[in-house]
């Protein structure tokens, strides 16, 4: 899921 990858980048 590409969208999830973007979300985790912000959470990290």
Curated annotation (Swiss-Prot):
One of its GO terms (molecular function) is beta-galactosidase activity. Keywords: Allergen, Apoplast, Glycosidase, Hydrolase, Secreted. Its EC number is 3.2.1.23. It catalyses: Hydrolysis of terminal non-reducing beta-D-galactose residues in beta-D-galactosides. It is an enzyme of class 3 (hydrolase). It is found in: Secreted, Extracellular space, Apoplast. The keyword Protein transport does not apply. GO terms for cellular component: apoplast. On the 2D-gel the determined pI of this protein is: 6.23, its MW is: 90 kDa. This is Beta-galactosidase.
